[in-house]
A protein has these predicted regions:
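N-terminal hydrophobic/helix-forming segments and targeting peptides
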Residues: 1-103
Length: 103
């Protein structure tokens, strides 16, 4: 028996199939916020791709559900005649993980 209902599975499928590389997080934010909408009273977003749902925002103590929605991404910059792929990174991924790696 799954602990995820159909709505949760649909959210997970939509979220995982959505491209949200660094700088283009808004699609992921929208999916996350639509899923949380029935459970929170307000949302806060920032320019870094964070979406926060707040329960009972006027209370002294609040419940906050937070998610950061970008993913590591690299762009193909060039492909050689021998099939070597040259990539450039997008965002803050570690540049030392890519050189001479099999893809």
């Amino acid at each position: 028996m799954s602990i995820l209902d159909k709505k949760a599975l649909k959210f997970l499928e939509d979220y995982l199939n959505n491209a949200a590389p660094t700088g283009y997080e808004s699609g992921g934010q929208k999916i996350w916020m639509n899923y949380l909408k029935p459970y929170v009273d307000e949302f806060i977003t920032d320019v870094y791709g964070t979406a926060v749902g707040v329960i009972n925002p006027e209370a002294k103590y609040k419940v906050v559900i937070e998610g950061h929605s970008d993913e590591i991404s690299w762009y193909v910059n060039y492909i050689t005649d021998n099939g070597l792929i040259y990539v450039i990174r997008n965002g803050g991924s570690d540049h030392q993980i890519a050189p001479s790696k099999w893809v």
